[in-house]
Amino acid sequence: MHGLVHVLVCGGTSVQWLDTTTQEWCRITGELSSAARGVGMRWITICPYVGWFTEMEREQVCKRIANATGGSIDRSTVTHLDNDGFTISFNVCADGQQRFVDVADSLPDSLITEDTLSTAMHSPALFDPDLIVVHGPANKVPQSLMWELGYSELVFVDTPWRRLQSSDVQQAISDFTTRERRFGGIDV
């Protein structure tokens, strides 16, 4: 057990997600399931690194992922409950600010608090990600991660998104476990 409950994998552009076939989504889902086994993980969230979708493209990507995983679609998210008891959630919105606006719009004004926003931003997961695995350059933070950056550890991997392997996520978990988490604290 590594203390990991929720891992977010951020990779690929919206164009790459559009071009990802049902078979490739099956493979990616299998790789993520394999990586989660044995470490106590309950949720994996996947989102694009950068880009945007038209409404028609968003629906196309969601349907392709749902067909590959047997998951259910709710707006911009496809959720798949794995046989091993954890949930994989694919959020097709690559714009963190837009995701925030969408979540805020979905809540009644009287219910908007930091807690309700956090819960809605990570739904179906109940917690902020412990670890974010970024498939992209280490000198640039993905625009999709506006909300998650405050309390999550980032690990950057060099593997191109569509070649994601369980070993990439397992190596990121290994890197995570050797870090001293300070949760925004600084040395005095």
List the predicted regions and their residue ranges:
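Flexible, compositionally biased loop and terminal segments
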Residues: M1-V188
